[in-house]
Regions:
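C-terminal-of-GTPase-core extension/linker across diverse P-loop GTPases
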Residues: 2-88, 96-109, 113, 117-124, ...
Length: 298
């Protein structure tokens, strides 16, 4: 309830004061920046920079391009239809003499710092290589941090295709990234510009969904209907009861469900409720977070 919010807010205020003390004015300015931030992530040489360059080329507006002093990521501002987007590129500097493992480790560290600063991550995969273990590892970084997610299969123009290629590729990606079924999937080419306008549309949609709020009344209707359709599990004669659901925050949308017994609320039933909410609101491209709280029966 509200007391929880207030308590959390106080805690957060103190924490922010501490943080600001250490970082001075600049850190705060970055926090207040409301522009959508998109991290372009992926293993080396999949075409991350070419995508940004191509997007820049299409719009011909470079608002700013300031190389980060302390980090390798370079922020590029692109203006489109009156909205400014900040693209965070994790390509970084190539050091020729570094060993492969070291480059991989650095690229993971860079990915983490970029992902932490973004709302939406675009994972770029090389169509000519298919989805690899390193791709799934990088995707996990964004998933764990609750970011909006788009998978862009690049160099789509460079592979031999028949009528089944896209279907097969889609199945492969979905299977390897089965923990993020919410991710949007696009097949693009930075080289030819194929579907790059669609990438922007998808970014807009995912940003909107990532900060979408659903009214409590509506959520409880959806939950009541879900419970009526599919009886909650019981254990040793005790049945799970779901009392109430409410959305507590966004980026990603986060919900609290009050139940009689947390132990009875299995992962699979939470997933079922999530699917019902997604059926109603889509929430494409964004993870949803659920917190289960116990309320003793009166």
């Amino acid at each position: 309830g509200s007391e929880m919010c207030i308590r959390d807010r106080l805690g957060l205020g103190d924490m922010l004061d501490e943080v600001v003390k250490h970082f001075g004015e600049n850190a705060l300015k970055e926090e207040e920046d409301e522009r959508p931030r998109i991290a372009i992530i992926g293993k080396p040489n999949v075409g991350k920079s070419s995508i940004i360059n191509k997007l820049l080329g299409e719009d011909r507006v470079i608002v700013s391009n300031i190389a980060g002093t302390t980090r390798d990521a370079i922020d590029t501002t692109i203006k489109r239809n009156g909205t400014e987007y900040v693209f965070i590129d994790t390509a970084g500097l190539r050091r020729k003499n570094k060993i492969k493992e070291e480059i991989e480790r650095y690229s993971i560290i860079r990915t983490v710092s970029a992902v932490e600063r973004c709302n939406v991550a675009v994972l770029v995969i090389d169509a000519t290589e298919g989805i690899t273990d390193q791709d799934t590892k990088i995707a996990g970084i964004a998933h764990e941090r609750g970011k909006g997610m788009i998978i862009a299969v690049n160099k789509w123009d460079a592979i031999e295709k028949n009528d089944k290629t896209m279907k097969k590729f889609t199945e492969d990606v979905r299977e390897k990234l089965s923990y993020m079924p919410y991710a949007e999937l696009l097949f693009i080419s930075a080289e030819t510009g194929q579907r790059l306008p669609k990438l922007f549309e998808t970014i807009d949609m995912v940003i909107e969904n990532h900060s979408l709020r659903v009214a409590t009344g509506v959520l409880n209707e959806i939950m009541a209907e879900a419970v009526a359709l599919n009886q909650p599990p019981s254990d040793k004669g005790k049945r799970l009861r779901l009392y109430y659901i409410t959305q507590v925050s966004v980026k990603p949308p986060t919900f609290v469900i009050f139940v009689n017994d947390k132990e009875l609320m299995h992962f699979s039933y939470t997933r079922y409720i999530e699917n019902k909410i997604r059926e109603a609101f889509g929430f494409k491209g964004t993870p949803l977070k659920f917190i289960i709280r116990e309320r003793k029966e009166k």
